[in-house]
Amino acid sequence: MLTLTHFLVLAAILFAISVLGIFLNRKNLIILLMAIELMLLAVNFNFIAFSHYLSDSAGQIFVFFILTVAAAESAIGLAILVVLFRNLQSINVEDLGSLKG
């Protein structure tokens, strides 16, 4: 049977992969957005695990709020990415400095 520890270890691994993805690849905006989404997924996984094992539905409610914010963040991030690609023909983070006025 799976215990709370199994879920917390899995969430910690997901979080570590996302932090590693952010630190190792700082040039590509798409990968940065995916790593941030993976980080939010790990947090949601913790909320669901604690909610299940403590028999409290508050964690599941928080997950819905976090998913809503993550969807809005993804939509705004991808819209900014499309505008950046149209203007600069690149999605590198280093090219953002040329947009300063």
From Swiss-Prot:
GO terms for biological process: ATP synthesis coupled electron transport. It comes from the Bacteria. It catalyses: a quinone + NADH + 5 H(+)(in) = a quinol + NAD(+) + 4 H(+)(out). It is a multi-pass membrane protein. Keywords: Cell inner membrane, Cell membrane, Membrane, NAD, Quinone, Translocase, Transmembrane, Transmembrane helix, Transport, Ubiquinone. GO terms for cellular component: NADH dehydrogenase complex; plasma membrane. Its EC number is 7.1.1.-. GO terms for molecular function: NADH:ubiquinone reductase (non-electrogenic) activity; quinone binding. The chain crosses the membrane at residues 4-24, 30-50, 61-81. NDH-1 shuttles electrons from NADH, via FMN and iron-sulfur (Fe-S) centers, to quinones in the respiratory chain. The immediate electron acceptor for the enzyme in this species is believed to be ubiquinone. Couples the redox reaction to proton translocation (for every two electrons transferred, four hydrogen ions are translocated across the cytoplasmic membrane), and thus conserves the redox energy in a proton gradient. Belongs to the complex I subunit 4L family. This is NADH-quinone oxidoreductase subunit K. The gene is nuoK.
